[in-house]
From Swiss-Prot:
SUPFAM superfamilies: S-adenosyl-L-methionine-dependent methyltransferases. It holds the Pfam family TPMT. One of its GO terms (biological process) is response to metal ion. It comes from Teredinibacter turnerae (strain ATCC 39867 / T7901). Its main location: cytoplasm. GO terms for molecular function: thiopurine S-methyltransferase activity. It catalyses: S-adenosyl-L-methionine + a thiopurine = S-adenosyl-L-homocysteine + a thiopurine S-methylether. This is Thiopurine S-methyltransferase. It comes from the Bacteria. Belongs to the class I-like SAM-binding methyltransferase superfamily. TPMT family. Its EC number is 2.1.1.67. The lineage of its organism: Bacteria, Pseudomonadati, Pseudomonadota, Gammaproteobacteria, Cellvibrionales.
Length: 214
C-alpha cells in the first residue's frame, strides 16, 4: 500500500476512519498501559481526538502521520499553535507535550523520539495489508524498545471487504508480536451495526507486554 493512497484519502475527504469521539477502547483500558507521566507513541495518528484525551491525562504525545493535512487539522482542533520545522525528510509539528512527525513511519529515526513509555495503536496495524505487518511491527519494536502496547484490531470475513481496515485475527497479532510480547485480550465484542455498517465483525482490544527475555 503506497503513501499516495492515504494522501488521496485526505485530499478527497474520504476519512470515514476518523472517529468523532474519543475511542472507548482507550478510555476504558488506559490504565493497562501504566503510562502516567510518561510518553505515548501513536502511529498513523491522523487527527484523532484520542490525542487530545491523552494530553488531558498528563502524558506527552508523540505521533507520526503521512498526511500534513491531517496534522494541521489536528492542531486546529486542539487549539494549539505548533512550531513547524524540517528534520531530514520529515516535518515536525510540535508544542508543549506533543510532537507529530509528518512522513513515513518506516523512515522515522529512533533517536528523534526519546524514551517511549507506551504505544497506542487504534488505527495503524489494521490499516496495513498483511504484506506490510511484520515490517511495521518490527519498526515499532525498534522505535520503542518493546514498550507496552494498547492495540485495537478487527476480525471479519476479508472476502466481504478489501480493507482498510483489514481483518487482523489473533493469529496475525501472534505472528507480528508473539516472540517479543505477551499478549492479553482485554476485551472482545461485536462491532455495533457491523463494520462499514454492513459487515459482521469483532473488535478486540489487546495489551501487549514485553517478554522478560526480549
Amino acid at each position: 500500500m503506497k503513501a499516495s493512497f492515504w494522501h488521496e484519502k485526505w485530499k478527497k475527504r474520504e476519512i470515514g476512519f476518523h472517529e468523532s469521539v474519543v475511542n472507548p477502547a482507550l478510555t476504558d483500558h488506559w490504565h493497562a498501559l501504566s503510562a502516567a507521566g510518561g510518553s505515548v507513541f501513536v502511529p498513523l495518528c491522523g487527527k484523532s481526538l484520542d490525542l487530545g484525551w491523552l494530553l488531558s491525562q498528563g502524558v506527552s504525545v508523540i505521533g507520526v502521520e503521512l498526511s500534513e493535512i491531517a496534522v494541521q487539522e489536528l492542531f486546529v482542533s486542539l487549539d494549539i499553535e505548533p512550531s513547524v520545522s524540517d528534520v531530514e525528510n520529515f516535518k515536525l509539528y510540535s508544542a508543549e507535550n506533543i510532537a507529530i512527525w509528518v512522513g513515513d513511519i518506516f523512515n522515522l529515526n529512533k533517536a528523534w523520539l526519546g524514551v517511549i513509555t507506551a504505544i497506542y495503536d487504534r488505527a495503524a496495524l489494521v490499516a496495513l495489508p498483511e504484506s506490510m505487518r511484520l515490517e511495521y511491527a518490527g519498526k515499532l519494536i525498534e522505535l520503542s524498545n518493546c514498550a507496552t502496547q494498547l492495540l485495537v484490531t478487527f476480525e471479519y470475513d476479508q472476502s466481504l471487504h478489501q480493507g482498510p481496515p483489514f481483518s487482523v485475527p489473533e493469529s496475525a497479532v501472534q505472528k507480528c508480536y508473539g516472540t517479543r510480547y505477551q499478549l492479553q485480550c482485554l476485551e472482545r465484542k461485536a462491532v455495533a451495526g457491523g463494520l462499514k455498517g454492513r459487515i459482521a465483525a469483532t473488535e478486540s482490544v489487546w495489551k501487549l507486554s514485553r517478554n522478560i527475555n526480549s
